[in-house]
Amino acid sequence: MSENLNREPELNIGYITQVIGPVIDAVFSAGQLPKIYNALEVKSKDGTTIICEVQQLFNDNRVRAIAMSATDGLQRGVEVIDTQAPILVPVGKATLGRIFNVLGQTVDNIEIGTGEDRLPIHRPAPSFTDLETKPAIFETGIKVVDLLAPYRRGGKIGLFGGAGVGKTVLIMELINNIAKAHGGVSVFGGVGERTREGNDLYMEMKESGVINESNLSESKVALVYGQMNEPPGARMRVGLTALTMAEYFRDINRQDVLLFIDNIFRFVQAGSEVSALLGRMPSAVGYQPTLGTEMGALQERITSTTQGSITSIQAVYVPADDLTDPAPATTFAHLDATTVLSRGLAAKGIYPAVDPLDSTSTMLQPVIVGSEHYDTAQLVKKTLQRYKELQDIIAILGIDELSEEDRLVVDRARKIERFLSQPFFVAEVFTGSPGKYVDLENTIKGFNMILNGELDVYQSIAFYLVGDINEAIAKAKTITN
């Protein structure tokens, strides 16, 4: 942008004709209209530069743009400069360990170098010929995820869960594991959520070592925030800023990238606000008529290419728990897997509190994961489902009233439930237990041994918060002795 400002003769200058909240109308000379999605610079009275993005062109040499920050102090007649490019954000190693806003400006009081690479936030999705077509499992090292609802490399995962069930810790563990096991990096896009949550996440990341304060380039994550106090334009575009940073790591550095979007519903909500401000006719339930297109433009860029992959984990808020609401319904069409966090499991102290029966994945097919993995997962689910059905009888009559066969099912299900828990690396600080990464082969082996009855002699408490099955057996022997 600064380059454009230095070339005086080519400056394309217009003037504000109207300001309505975050919406600005500006008039330019005939034949000099900025393109759609171009960034416009406006200087406010106090000297701050406000960036707006062109949304509509009118036939009287007028454009309508949406501001990325507050428009306080703007008035008619103020100069508007067309930067002749979309919003450009910094990319690459310099972004690691840092916090950015929608415009790629740092908000952590540490300056970023001027020579950094920058890319526009509006880019085409990878072409069909560049896509990686063979489905591959993205191993996370988290037993419950890898066994029952495996993630697809370059796929999209919906993360469902209320407050206080462990979303943040699960997100941080995934960031940690992708860095260690895949040599990858992560980008976190905070879209329209609470500023306090963004601050807490940053502090927890520093505490757990995900962000290395003494050497920022050794950090494993870049953070981009457009929180709920921001104008709708910023909340609508912050997801694209985070995605652009992730694309650079995938396409140029050829890395596997994890992209977190918290919350994808707020992206839709911001788009709905902008749509209303621009005077578009609302669609079902008051959402924008372009809902499907906007969601598709974001989701289609999240994919595996021959260079690397972007695997996206998106927190999904379901308004009024209505899954048929157009916002979550449109999101579901793009998801490959869902990870549902259960308050009931969290109350039992089973972490990660991933619900083994509600979480799903399109990858759990014998052709993709192999018959051993598939059969083990189905048998685990069947055992847990039977245990769930028997819980009412146990609560009323007690376990002694069950048949011998059902008692065996309950015993194995309790072992499975506890074995699905796991100590996390990022939780070491407050649990005191060292974290464990369990590869898929050991995960399948462990659950098979429980299902086959090889471990019936051991107490179920030995399976709680352990890594692989050998650790559980060693713990069980210690308890017995």
UniProtKB/Swiss-Prot annotation:
Gene Ontology CC annotation, any one: chloroplast thylakoid membrane
Keywords attached to this Swiss-Prot or TrEMBL record, sorted alphabetically, are: ATP synthesis, ATP-binding, CF(1), Chloroplast, Hydrogen ion transport, Ion transport, Membrane, Nucleotide-binding, Plastid, Thylakoid, Translocase, Transport
**What is the reaction catalyzed?**
ATP + H2O + 4 H(+)(in) = ADP + phosphate + 5 H(+)(out)
For this chain, the annotated S-S bridges are none
User: Where do the annotations place ATP binding?
Assistant: G161, G162, A163, G164, V165, G166, K167, T168
Principal location: plastid
Q: Fetch the InterPro entries from UniProt.
A: AAA+_ATPase, ATP-synt_VA_C, ATP_synth_F1_bsu, ATPase_a/bsu_AS, ATPase_alpha/beta_chains, ATPase_F1/V1/A1_a/bsu_N, ATPase_F1/V1/A1_a/bsu_N_sf, ATPase_F1/V1/A1_a/bsu_nucl-bd
Q: How does it assemble?
A: F-type ATPases have 2 components, CF(1) - the catalytic core - and CF(0) - the membrane proton channel. CF(1) has five subunits: alpha(3), beta(3), gamma(1), delta(1), epsilon(1). CF(0) has four main subunits: a(1), b(1), b'(1) and c(9-12).
Q: Annotated Gene Ontology MF terms? A: ATP binding; ATP hydrolysis activity; proton-transporting ATP synthase activity, rotational mechanism
The answer to whether UniProt assigns keyword rRNA processing to this entry is: no
Enzyme class, top EC level, equals: translocase
**What is the protein name for this chain?**
ATP synthase subunit beta, chloroplastic
Q: Which HAMAP family match?
A: ATP_synth_beta_bact (MF_01347)
Give EC number(s), comma-separated.
7.1.2.2
As for membrane topology, the entry says:
Peripheral membrane protein
